[in-house]
Amino acid sequence: MASSAQIHGLGTASFSSLKKPSSISGNSKTLFFGQRLNSNHSPFTRAAFPKLSSKTFKKGFTLRVVSEKVVGIDLGTTNSAVAAMEGGKPTIITNAEGQRTTPSVVAYTKNGDRLVGQIAKRQAVVNPENTFFSVKRFIGRKMSEVDEESKQVSYRVIRDDNGNVKLDCPAIGKSFAAEEISAQVLRKLVDDASKFLNDKVTKAVVTVPAYFNDSQRTATKDAGRIAGLEVLRIINEPTAASLAYGFERKNNETILVFDLGGGTFDVSVLEVGDGVFEVLSTSGDTHLGGDDFDKRVVDWLAGDFKRDEGIDLLKDKQALQRLTETAEKAKMELSSLSQTNISLPFITATADGPKHIETTLTRAKFEELCSDLLDRLRTPVENSLRDAKLSIKDIDEVILVGGSTRIPAVQELVKKLIGKDPNVTVNPDEVVALGAAVQAGVLAGDVSDIVLLDVSPLSLGLETLGGVMTKIIPRNTTLPTSKSEVFSTAADGQTSVEINVLQGEREFVRDNKSLGSFRLDGIPPAPRGVPQIEVKFDIDANGILSVAAIDKGTGKKQDITITGASTLPGDEVERMVSEAERFSKEDKEKREAIDTKNQADSVVYQTEKQLKELGEKVPAPVKEKVEAKLGELKEAITGGSTQTIKDALAALNQEVMQLGQSLYNQPGAAGQAGPTPPGSESGPSESSGKEGPEGDVIDADFTDSK
């Protein structure tokens, strides 16, 4: 019977992705799984790569995608943005509505139509249960991890059979994975980018919070696949911001990126200069963002109303949505005003009649409501500086990223912590997408002389004796990296072992994130301690983990499938990809149907107008034919298919052409009203025209026929 408590660790090998794993020496000491090797037997390096000059890196490590546009996407909790390299500079791409950012909102109407972006956000109050926002807070997570977040939204967050998060959509009787909703936002961004660039976009660099764990990164990549995108690279948001800030800057600087978005908080310390962007450390909190500040205002408003009226507005989905939107608006206004008026008429009704909310929120009261959230911003900043082995005096610039950094109390806190005014030369809503575009340009070969060295945000390890986490790859290890551990059996004839892979910084398994467990079967029966199974952990440049195992005795490589992770299984992703393609096809067909119908309506109107204007000038047989085809087109518009409308439209156009021809074939057609080619208007005849006083002024009627 295999158990994680019955595995021998025979030694540890640590190596970069450039080197082969060192062989295990014959005299390596055997110890029980769960014991730490001393420093002589555990040669972990702090980073996969030592500090190298940019010249060293410029020779390799670059994935090239030739002659194809690669975009950078900031997939945000509240808003998303897309950018591309244009004319050698990163440029924000405006969406179909002409906006530089797109709300990360997806909605389904009662008739099954899907809305994405601003149009979805506008109807949230009247359709709260089918409007999905802040979905990024649920991506790649188990239901047990999002208890607090699930109470902040107006839609139902449910648990599936594996304990993963699903979002219920009663309008179409379906539940979605968070990846599917995010994929629909990505799809809109890419479609809008394709139109803007006049080139089909299929490849992208997508950003994630620096403190996202492996499951969340994998889920984000899956969202890209479902959207029909090839995600070439997942990069951290603070790192992307530094790329945008440091692009084309030559001087060396140590910068701290303070990234407070709608749902997450990250802090990264980087060395930037001469094209090299090296992340020294990163820290953060994936349960802290602008949504939490909004929630404090919502709770305050709902609490006061319950005290005065005895009604809990948080149980009313529509009222909750109105409160949430009002709280966000009030928060934004308090960034420039000392107080704001909150007015919510007809928020609910009782037997006594309709009830309203009319109150004033001051900036001081807002800061009081959010005081503990502001305190939570301190620790990641301090941790990041400590891990980078730097003091506040070593920081040259502080870059603010994310819309929530506009809150005056946040800016004041940063100033107190670092001792200098933040740099305000970058747009906090756009800088991440711009940085992603720079990285996209590097991968596409449009940008050279840039080297990016990122780090793993969280430690990676295994469950060992007593429910303890033994760290294999420590946090802030430069990526990509690869480390291995050699295991053996703890019992004679043992043929399998089971290992739980963990990510986090706490000492005990229960306090860390389980990425899943794998069972290694097929070990040849042998006395205990004889088999040597090397388990290798690889973290790629995206920060995504893969695990492999090799039986060192036979050289046989075992395929390991991690189970129980909070990401979607492969077959589920494939199903969602095909479903998204089907939806995309249906959307195109719906759009074509609408465009065809609109065109047909316009032709009907123009034809009827033309018949009315021409009146008796149209020969009766021709008029009858046109009217017959007009009737057929009207019938097709009322209940016909798109193809039927197209056929009827073509037939009507043919008859209208005949109508025009018949007008010109009539005697005296030159004087008839009708479509006249530009420049062919004739002057007055000798008998009827009159010259003006100067002999060059003509009395005539001018008809502009279009």
Curated annotation (Swiss-Prot):
<feature type="compositionally biased region" description="Acidic residues">
    <location>
        <begin position="694"/>
        <end position="706"/>
    </location>
</feature>
<dbReference type="InterPro" id="IPR012725">
    <property type="entry name" value="Chaperone_DnaK"/>
</dbReference>
<feature type="compositionally biased region" description="Low complexity">
    <location>
        <begin position="666"/>
        <end position="687"/>
    </location>
</feature>
<comment type="similarity">
    <text>Belongs to the heat shock protein 70 family.</text>
</comment>
<dbReference type="InterPro" id="IPR043129">
    <property type="entry name" value="ATPase_NBD"/>
</dbReference>
<dbReference type="GO" id="GO:0005524">
    <property type="term" value="F:ATP binding"/>
</dbReference>
<dbReference type="Pfam" id="PF00012">
    <property type="entry name" value="HSP70"/>
</dbReference>
<feature type="transit peptide" description="Chloroplast">
    <location>
        <begin position="1"/>
        <end position="67"/>
    </location>
</feature>
<keyword id="KW-0934">Plastid</keyword>
<keyword id="KW-0809">Transit peptide</keyword>
<feature type="region of interest" description="Disordered">
    <location>
        <begin position="663"/>
        <end position="706"/>
    </location>
</feature>
<dbReference type="InterPro" id="IPR029047">
    <property type="entry name" value="HSP70_peptide-bd_sf"/>
</dbReference>
<dbReference type="InterPro" id="IPR029048">
    <property type="entry name" value="HSP70_C_sf"/>
</dbReference>
<keyword id="KW-0547">Nucleotide-binding</keyword>
<dbReference type="GO" id="GO:0140662">
    <property type="term" value="F:ATP-dependent protein folding chaperone"/>
</dbReference>
<protein>
    <recommendedName>
        <fullName>Stromal 70 kDa heat shock-related protein, chloroplastic</fullName>
    </recommendedName>
</protein>
<dbReference type="GO" id="GO:0009570">
    <property type="term" value="C:chloroplast stroma"/>
</dbReference>
<keyword id="KW-0150">Chloroplast</keyword>
<dbReference type="InterPro" id="IPR018181">
    <property type="entry name" value="Heat_shock_70_CS"/>
</dbReference>
<keyword id="KW-0346">Stress response</keyword>
<dbReference type="InterPro" id="IPR013126">
    <property type="entry name" value="Hsp_70_fam"/>
</dbReference>
<dbReference type="GO" id="GO:0051082">
    <property type="term" value="F:unfolded protein binding"/>
</dbReference>
<keyword id="KW-0067">ATP-binding</keyword>
<comment type="function">
    <text>Interacts with newly imported chloroplast proteins to assist in their maturation.</text>
</comment>
